[in-house]
């Protein structure tokens, strides 16, 4: 998008898109950061649980390779520790299966970070319960010291039985009950803000921006994010990069030569979860500005409206 919007115009747009009531989707989804073996390997415990959790309409699953890679690629002045703390503030629960070299590293790092440790649930193969190992004497012991429900043990058969079951059948199983009790405890003791300042929810601001500002470029999105999310410039760019990557993977937006555009799927989603009347009035006012080169949006023409 080559059009130039003044700071005042950007602030007016931000005011509308962040106004209480503009977003009308569900706020109750549980966000789970799922770590473990290769999710593409159908035998990995992480893959099995991801398939089971996908049966729940109130659960969003995020993977370190999707989120952390985007964060680390642009971390610049931000240390890994600060990015881990951002993650700790963003997700409800971290579930980790120590089943691969990468997940061993994550377990060690997360268990030693106080903010992450409070949200971590480690699910360990029961056959390693009594094994004399660094994992048992280090991270696992540390987790159990702070929260006895943070380490669950089960057999591969127990996990498979739960993951292959319907939700109604799974509710009767011991592993399901233990897992839900652990998740409930973590969420009760660690409240998460789910506004656009949360990296996992920043798309609630950026997606309608892309919807309204046809072919908006990366630079403009970063400027808007910096002013709306109120993080520093580097972190704002990291958040935009992460959100844009996720939206492209979800096929809600496309990256064109001149900027980003919503797909039909993305447009349908935007109109289903945001206030349609406000969207339509904003779009009309933006078109008028582009045609007439008005100095500001006419804020009075776009009152907050209920559909």
UniProtKB/Swiss-Prot annotation:
InterPro entries: STM3845-like. The keyword Ribonucleoprotein does not apply. GO terms for biological process: defense response to virus. Keywords: Antiviral defense. It comes from the Bacteria. Possible ribosyltransferase/DNA-binding component of antiviral defense system retron Ec86, composed of a non-coding RNA (ncRNA), a ribosyltransferase/DNA-binding protein and a reverse transcriptase (RT). Expression of the 3-gene retron confers protection against bacteriophages T5. At multiplicity of infection (MOI) of 0.02 cultures grow normally when infected with T5 without collapsing, at MOI 2 cultures enter growth stasis. This is Retron Ec86 putative ribosyltransferase/DNA-binding protein.
